[in-house]
């Protein structure tokens, strides 16, 4: 029986590497997968999943109004798994479409993304994945300032912490830092 998996972690926790690893393992066995990512994430190009260590692959970009269920249902070859990067940027309807892929097409879906934003609010996609996922796993990494587990994301601009502003601002290591709770409120900048 297929399931909807939600695997979340802070920045630099290896979410995209995990997607690429899972895809490789399926494909090594001759089992096709579909890799998708939010159309909002254009850091490394449109429709690209890219890890910070340099591994990258093309992916199907997901817009907020895309009918993911119909897209997967109409593929000529049924995938063995659907892998989603940057799932925090998905709309509520996108997440419900993923649940339908699992329930009606019997295709496992693994969604990877951030849980909370730099203000410690849930992203729309994260909120609905937490509600609908059959299995929820945390991908762990450590705080940039100490050896505790990072549970939050600190946004910085010009070396200063930022706690207000737009929820979505696509960035990389230079803008967002994985931190523990202590260093979120008292960063060593």
Swiss-Prot record:
Belongs to the thymidine kinase family. Keywords: ATP-binding, Cytoplasm, DNA synthesis, Kinase, Metal-binding, Nucleotide-binding, Transferase, Zinc. Pfam families: TK. GO terms for molecular function: ATP binding; thymidine kinase activity; zinc ion binding. It comes from the Bacteria. It comes from Streptococcus pyogenes serotype M28 (strain MGAS6180). GO terms for biological process: DNA biosynthetic process; thymidine metabolic process. It catalyses: thymidine + ATP = dTMP + ADP + H(+). PROSITE patterns: TK_CELLULAR_TYPE. Zn(2+) binds at residues 143, 146, 180, 183. ATP binds at residues 9-16, 85-88. It is an enzyme of class 2 (transferase). This is Thymidine kinase. The active site is at residue 86. Its main location: cytoplasm. Homotetramer.
């Amino acid at each position: 029986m297929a399931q909807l998996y939600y695997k979340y972690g802070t920045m630099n926790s290896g979410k995209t590497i995990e997607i690429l690893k899972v895809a490789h393992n399926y494909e090594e066995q001759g089992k096709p997968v579909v890799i998708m990512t939010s159309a909002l994430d254009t850091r490394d190009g449109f429709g690209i999943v890219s890890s910070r260590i340099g591994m990258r692959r093309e992916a199907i970009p997901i817009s907020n109004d895309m009918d993911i269920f119909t897209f997967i249902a109409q593929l000529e070859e049924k995938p063995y798994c659907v892998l989603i990067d940057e799932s925090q940027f998905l709309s509520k309807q996108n997440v419900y479409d993923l649940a339908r892929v699992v329930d009606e097409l019997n295709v496992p879906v693994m969604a990877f993304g951030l849980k909370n934003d730099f203000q410690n609010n849930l992203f729309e996609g994260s909120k609905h994945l937490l509600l609908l996922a059959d299995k929820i796993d945390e991908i762990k990494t450590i705080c940039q300032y100490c050896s505790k587990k990072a549970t939050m994301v600190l946004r910085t601009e010009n070396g200063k912490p930022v706690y207000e502003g737009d929820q979505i601002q696509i960035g990389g290591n230079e803008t967002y830092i994985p931190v523990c709770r202590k260093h979120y409120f008292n960063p060593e900048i």
